[in-house]
Amino acid sequence: RWLCRCKYCRGFGVQSPSAYSFIRYVINEHYPYYAYSELEERYEMPSRLQHKLGRLLFRLANYWQPEKCYSIESLYFPYINAGCHKSVICNLYDLYDSSTKNLVVIDLDHIDKDELYSSILPFCNESTLLVVLGLNHGKNKQFWHRLQYSEYTGITYNLYYAGIVFFDKSKYKQHYQVNF
């Protein structure tokens, strides 16, 4: 199974320079960041995968530098705040401010997918970065495919356990499979 995923490692085969850079230096960055050891000591994660996702959210917050972070999952807030100190944590259902840079983190196991599609996605724009957790379950995979081909979304990255969605319509719509 691991050998089948090898072709999706470290940005191999990605032609877009910006997508390659994002995959290589944000998603699959392996160098230890300044806050990793402190976060490990202060906040205990229930599983190794959740710790890995916390590190990913740290790197995404560091890359995107959002002014606001919207989520209902509080487990990852310390990682997001460590990645971007200026970011303010807000309730997911208060996502109506499209003038600021936003990071939206959603766990598909803890949210109504139809409500997400009808109530939250219309407020996402090019200043929004959406992170979708819990993709590796049957119905969640179906929703992810629906989300990828939605008129709202732009470039998407499927990391098997999580998905990342950009809403910039000025770029050609692409879907990348990334071994995370």
Predicted regions and their residues:
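A short alpha-helical cap/connector motif
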Residues: 1-125, 136-180
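Glycine-centered, small-residue-biased loops immediately flanking beta-strands
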Residues: 128
